[in-house]
Swiss-Prot record:
Classification via InterPro entries: ATP-cone_dom (IPR005144), NrdR-like_N (IPR055173), RNR_NrdR-like (IPR003796)
Protein role: Negatively regulates transcription of bacterial ribonucleotide reductase nrd genes and operons by binding to NrdR-boxes.
Entries under Pfam families matching the protein: ATP-cone (PF03477), Zn_ribbon_NrdR (PF22811)
Entry protein name: Transcriptional repressor NrdR
């Protein structure tokens, strides 16, 4: 890590704290040469393997954008979307792998979204599961009701 002030490559860690529910570490550093202090954030990179085989870094923002579309016109706050995106990231990181397939992210979105707003869940599921008819919606609603009764 180079000092942002003098570009020296030696620094010492003064303080370390876990942030983002344990998914990152914030370190306060001091340059051994100029004595200026700066902060770094370390996070294990999570790559998403897309359907076409390409990879890209996981983005909470992309989760929020996709779910926001399903929540359009619904009473769902930005804070609730941010919490959902954090839950999704935590869930996919539990796989313990540095790469995850895009469809697994969709699966990780479904349950927290259902708990947040059932209409938004149905909208998202209709795209994610490629619903083709009203029968697909009816089947999903029956499945939701069965799950509700068993809980």
């Amino acid at each position: 890590m180079y000092c942002p002030f003098c570009h020296n490559d030696q620094s010492r860690v003064i303080d370390s704290r876990v942030i983002d529910s344990g998914s990152a570490i914030r370190r306060r550093r001091e340059c051994t040469q100029c004595k200026n202090r700066f902060t770094t954030v370390e996070k294990a990179q999570l790559l998403v393997v897309k359907r076409n085989g390409l990879t890209e870094p996981f983005s909470r923002e992309k989760v929020i954008v996709g779910v926001r579309r399903a929540c359009q016109g619904r009473d769902v706050s930005d804070d609730a979307l941010k919490r959902l995106a954090q839950q999704v990231e935590e869930r996919v990181r539990l796989h313990g792998s540095s790469q995850i397939h895009a469809n697994e992210i969709g699966l990780a979105i479904l349950e927290p979204l259902r708990e947040l707003d059932e209409v938004a869940y149905l909208r998202f599921a209709s795209v994610y599961k490629s619903f083709e008819s009203a029968d697909d919606f009816e089947s999903e609603i029956r499945l939701m009701r069965r799950r509700d009764r068993s809980n």
